[in-house]
Regions:
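C-terminal helix/juxtamembrane-tail motif
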Residues: 116-120
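Conserved DEDDh/DEDDy metal-dependent 3′-5′ exonuclease domain
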Residues: 1-113
Length: 120
């Protein structure tokens, strides 16, 4: 997992290429706002973006958020405590970095579970 503070460095061409590449799947929960904020940094056409919360709703899964889906499909709970901290800080704390890495890893693992269970 790579963590970039894009509000500090901007959205470089290589990251825009990843976000616009239909061959690279990008997944997570409630991505609409994240994508809008990224497009404010630099315009791009998002491709192969999968919102797992929306997929869960379409499949009538009882949970739609990161914590609930993680518990249901991966069998453990993650803390959301660091999610409400100051993400614009010049230097992220170890807890913020761990949360961001966990969020990305869990999204990837949930994608595989959803794919295997044909929920996408």
């Amino acid at each position: 997992v790579y963590i970039f503070q894009l509000n500090k460095v901007g959205l470089c061409k290589s990251i825009r290429h990843i976000l616009s590449n239909p061959d690279i799947i990008k997944c997570g929960i409630a991505l609409k706002r994240d994508l809008a904020e990224l497009m404010q940094l630099s315009p791009f056409d998002p491709e192969a973006v999968i919102d797992l919360g929306a997929a869960a709703r379409r499949a009538d899964v009882p949970h739609h958020g990161l914590r609930g889906l993680t518990a249901l499909f991966l069998g453990f709970r993650i803390s959301k405590r660091a999610s409400t901290t100051n993400w614009s800080a010049r230097k992220l704390s170890a807890k913020q970095i761990t949360y961001a890495a966990t969020d990305a890893w869990v999204g990837r693992e949930l994608y595989f579970k959803f794919r295997d269970k044909k929920l996408l």
